[in-house]
UniProtKB/Swiss-Prot annotation:
Pfam families: PseudoU_synth_2. Keywords: Isomerase, RNA-binding, rRNA processing. One of its GO terms (biological process) is enzyme-directed rRNA pseudouridine synthesis. It comes from Buchnera aphidicola subsp. Schizaphis graminum (strain Sg). Belongs to the pseudouridine synthase RsuA family. It catalyses: uridine(2605) in 23S rRNA = pseudouridine(2605) in 23S rRNA. Disulfide bonds: none annotated. PROSITE patterns: PSI_RSU, S4. Residues 3-63 form the S4 RNA-binding domain. This is Ribosomal large subunit pseudouridine synthase B. Its EC number is 5.4.99.22. GO terms for molecular function: 23S rRNA pseudouridine(2605) synthase activity; RNA binding. Responsible for synthesis of pseudouridine from uracil-2605 in 23S ribosomal RNA. InterPro entries: PsdUridine_s_RsuA/RluB/E/F_cat (IPR042092), PsdUridine_synth_cat_dom_sf (IPR020103), PsdUridine_synth_RsuA/RluA (IPR006145), PsdUridine_synth_RsuA/RluB/E/F (IPR000748), PsdUridine_synth_RsuA/RluB_CS (IPR018496), RsuA_PseudoU_synthase (IPR050343), S4_RNA-bd (IPR002942), S4_RNA-bd_sf (IPR036986).
Amino acid sequence: MTAKIQKILSDLGYGSRRFIECMIKCGKISINGEKAIIGQYLNKKNPGEILIDKKKIIVKRNKNLPKVLIYNKPIGEVCTRDDFQKRLTVFDKLPKLNLNRWVSVGRLDINTKGLLLFTNDGTLANKLMHPRSQIEREYNIRIFGEMNKNKINILRKGVKIIHGYVSFKEIVPLYDKKEGKNKWFKGILCEGKNREIRLMFKSIQCQVNQLIRVRYGNIILPKNLKEGQWMMLNSIFLKKLYNLINFDKEIINKKKN
């Protein structure tokens, strides 16, 4: 049985398919001594010698349960695996895996905090991130600037930013959270583009000065999970997550050995 190289490496936990495509374009992946090609088909059981950044990878399937964890990202951490500026990354505090690597389900910019999901199942990560899945991302947003019903309606209908036209699925004031001239809102999106929320508010002359992701799909950030801490999802929540994308994963119904 064959599969595309980006799917094979994604399933092994080496990043999302898009990330792997970028590495291939940059010439960082080789197969049997030759540069890999995007969309190249390989034998899933015996794909040959694969090098990533000149390091040989072990193509060994993880026979254990798929793993997903919640990480409460603090401000100041970046979502890259290796940062050339040597800043703290969200991967630094995660538990080590024996056979593969953690894949982040989307990203949060350095000044955003809150819920990040990580998994060792590249297919799950890809489906949760893909715009076609329409997975909700919920944020608590603190803004500085004048807000009114007209501006809220503009954000609901859609504004043009560098990524194109974007809109909130839901945007409502949080009246129980007020801090002087700052105002809090709950915002829900079904996509995750770079600095999207900040740019949306900037387009209506408001500044986002605090942004917290509190929910991704049906996974809510636990109130007792402190910043910089992680928590592994149990089999019940794993099943809910797979059901969210209509993805039948028989292995989650099996008991861990």
